[in-house]
């Protein structure tokens, strides 16, 4: 089943070609610009290309519009109305029969009438990526939930997705930490004493202070880095233990968030680094700057106008994240055979990734005509005071504490709303609502901007919130329970028949699900989907207000419209990483 947008695009492409045969010479790549109408009085969609065509064809825009409409008279079956407005806009309204039939297809098809791609792509998404021996904080929440929602989207659309956790698990920090633990926690290194991430974080902070202040400790830490790089057994065992403790703590968060991801840290790429540097040198891309091997790229300067370096080898012979990211992009293209690479990090790393992509192109690793690469930047999480979100003591909020607080807040709200609810059921609901509220609050903001974190706001049952959408789903589940309907039998014997204006509005919006997913897949903005779902819930509430379901001649057809709404709502929330519940 085609999207409504593509149905119209095909109609107008043909009508325009028939009306103006010379257009194929004047603009061989002409594509009609069609957008959803902003107001109900302008129909369902609007054709906006008449002005552009008028300039090309040297005609009056309204005459252009009239010529196109004249060619559409034989194509009216999907459309009930075509009107020319203003200087040449063409407003279109789909027939209720066409919409009803397409809703029947969506409702009965397991994949919503959305065709699977003829050639699925391999899409590699790099997200979350905390630094080992450090707590995950609210910034990691953004990368994690945005990355997970995009992965779920592409999986639903039928692509093969590899979810990678590019852990910061290598470098000087480990030398510092191992050297410090040898002095302060030898029993932990020997395996006699257990520890956790909280202790590792504390030791890391102390080791950093010591590294900055004590030259002798700095020397010992650097020796530990060398030992680690050379594969010495004791150093490797200490490193392995630190990684495992960190990953165990991260896994608790991923389980709470219902996020699946493959750990593949910086250390994975270590064997490839010397060859990458050598290859870049052979290709004449490397220049020596202050003893370091650097790549300088056009268009990347600092505030003083000096060229920014992509440093692929430090003056002491060591490697850094520039080298690792060059190795990673090479590996993802040549070893993983990725068709599309997506990196999700804070906006502060945008220049770094633009430079990596440009350098990969110059090195002939990346051919952007064959492989699409995207850096997906996101803004900061702010507190209600407008400053970077922190605890009351000024510390960065631990992500695990944030999630537990959201669950507890949701539990309190549910206790107040429904004191008779069984505790086990309430705790289950509180988890779905609390985690869902945090995810949705993040995803419903345009990721490029900053957003303000507020438990109170995100857990409200009104407005564009997870609770509002989850409650719309609960409402439909309640309708089905009250009617005790045999849904398979209703599906077999009844077809949707849109009559009332709010039925038509709801049905039209349901059928825009596919084109919404296409938009999100292209610009990687999850708020495309949250906006769609919020409008869906609002349109359902308007339908429910105006159109009685139970005990009317239209009971079964309206029940099917409720079911189509619930089906899309559930799938949309699943793509965002939220779970639906039948009761609340």
From Swiss-Prot:
Instruction: Give the stretches traversing the membrane.
Output: none
Identify the enzyme class: ligase
Reactions catalysed: tRNA(Arg) + L-arginine + ATP = L-arginyl-tRNA(Arg) + AMP + diphosphate
Keyword line: Aminoacyl-tRNA synthetase, ATP-binding, Cytoplasm, Ligase, Nucleotide-binding, Protein biosynthesis
Q: Which GO terms describe its molecular function?
A: arginine-tRNA ligase activity; ATP binding
Protein EC: 6.1.1.19
Query: Source organism's superkingdom?
Result: Bacteria
Which biological processes are named by the entry's GO terms?
A: arginyl-tRNA aminoacylation
Gene3D superfamilies per record: Arginyl tRNA synthetase N-terminal domain (3.30.1360.70), HUPs (3.40.50.620), Isoleucyl-tRNA Synthetase, Domain 1 (1.10.730.10)
Which family is this protein grouped under?
Answer: Belongs to the class-I aminoacyl-tRNA synthetase family.
Describe, as the record does, how this protein assembles with itself and its partners. Answer: Monomer.
Protein's name according to its UniProt entry:
Arginine--tRNA ligase
Q: Which organism is it from?
A: Protochlamydia amoebophila (strain UWE25)
Lineage at the top is: Bacteria, Pseudomonadati, Chlamydiota, Chlamydiia, Parachlamydiales
Name of encoding gene:
argS
